[in-house]
């Protein structure tokens, strides 16, 4: 399998940025840990601040973290009775927050990252890759999306939410699943493209909802096989016309592309409104984002 780690090695320190990571599957999930390693190898400064437990489907819920219960953190990654927040014993960049995804990324943005970076705050927020897709009716309830929209709207930090159709919850210390490696490489490609486009990385109050298709060692098995499609989160039947792209002023629906046509190795990238998590219905803003992503975008046949 070829890897975008080759691309990562080419990222100069001048392009390296400060990144905060979170998710809703838990801080010790293999997907986010694999992505952390890839981002670190690319030369970025990365702080991971994720929930102590699986918080899937919690949307934009937010409450102060509490002492970890007697069961401990997910995947036995911290013992029962641990403090409300904590860090890996050997790597202070890896942090848990015993609360919701929004609370977790907020802790990372406001407390943990500035503490590790001499007061500096993140320049980019990345959530996921989520275990499972986040399309259509799933989007408003997704903690992965909720954390990204908090970063984009409240913290005013450009944010990207990543989700992958394949895989089951896996501990950080289990053998790294094939899907985690592929999704980390694909997520790095999107991230690097946005960074290389220059600041501001995204228009204010917008986020990207990125979904990866099902992968296996026999189908969609190499990063070079994937095509990135610019899509909508919702269908847009009653919305104003979209940006003029790929010969149309109506972007394809991400659910149709990822769930029905995903076997063609399509990655969907949808521009989201951080205020309500739906598609950003502004053709001019969509065009700005298209221009940033244009080096990797393709059109559907």
Regions of interest found by a model, annotated:
Residues 25-32, 98-102, 137-144, 176-184:
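Solvent-exposed, acidic/flexible segments
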Residues 108-109, 113-167:
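Internal, conserved structured core segments that host functional sites
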Residues 25-28, 52-57, 100-105, 130-135, ...:
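Solvent-exposed loop/turn segments at secondary-structure junctions
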Residues 1-17:
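Fungal secretory targeting signals
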Residues 19, 29-110, 116-117:
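A cross-family phosphate/adenosyl-ligand binding-site feature
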Residues 18-22, 46-50, 96, 123-128, ...:
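Structural recognition of the beta-strand scaffold that forms the well-ordered cores
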Residues 174-301:
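Electrostatically charged, flexible surface regions
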Residues 40-41, 87-89, 117-120, 153-154, ...:
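Extracellular/periplasmic catalytic domains that process cell-envelope and extracellular macromolecules
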């Amino acid at each position: 399998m070829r890897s975008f780690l080759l691309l990562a090695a080419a990222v100069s320190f001048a392009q390296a940025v400060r990144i905060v990571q979170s998710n809703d599957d838990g801080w010790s999930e293999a997907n986010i840990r694999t992505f952390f390693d890839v981002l670190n190898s690319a030369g970025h400064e990365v702080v991971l601040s994720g929930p102590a437990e699986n918080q899937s489907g919690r949307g934009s819920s937010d409450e102060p973290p509490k002492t970890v219960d007697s069961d401990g953190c997910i995947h036995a990654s911290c013992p029962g009775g641990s403090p409300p927040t904590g860090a890996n014993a050997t790597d202070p960049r890896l942090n848990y927050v015993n609360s919701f995804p929004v609370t977790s990324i907020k802790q990372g943005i406001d407390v943990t990252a500035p503490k590790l970076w001499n007061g500096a705050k993140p320049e980019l927020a990345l959530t996921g890759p989520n275990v499972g897709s986040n399309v259509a009716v799933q989007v408003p309830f997704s903690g992965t999306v909720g954390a990204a929209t908090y970063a984009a709207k409240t913290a005013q930090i450009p944010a990207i939410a990543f989700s992958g159709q394949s895989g089951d919850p896996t501990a950080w210390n289990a053998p790294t699943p094939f899907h985690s490696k592929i999704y980390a490489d694909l997520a790095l490609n999107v991230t690097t493209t946005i960074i290389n486009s220059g600041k501001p990385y995204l228009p204010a109050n917008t986020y990207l909802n990125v979904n990866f298709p099902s992968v296996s060692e026999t189908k969609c098995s190499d990063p070079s096989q994937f095509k990135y499609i610019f899509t909508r989160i919702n269908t847009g039947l009653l919305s104003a016309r979209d940006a003029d792209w790929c010969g149309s002023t109506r972007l394809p629906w991400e659910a149709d592309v990822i769930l029905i046509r995903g076997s063609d190795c399509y990655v969907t990238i949808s521009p989201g409104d951080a205020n309500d998590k739906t598609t950003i219905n502004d053709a001019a803003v969509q065009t700005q984002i298209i221009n940033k992503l244009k080096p990797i975008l393709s059109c559907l046949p």
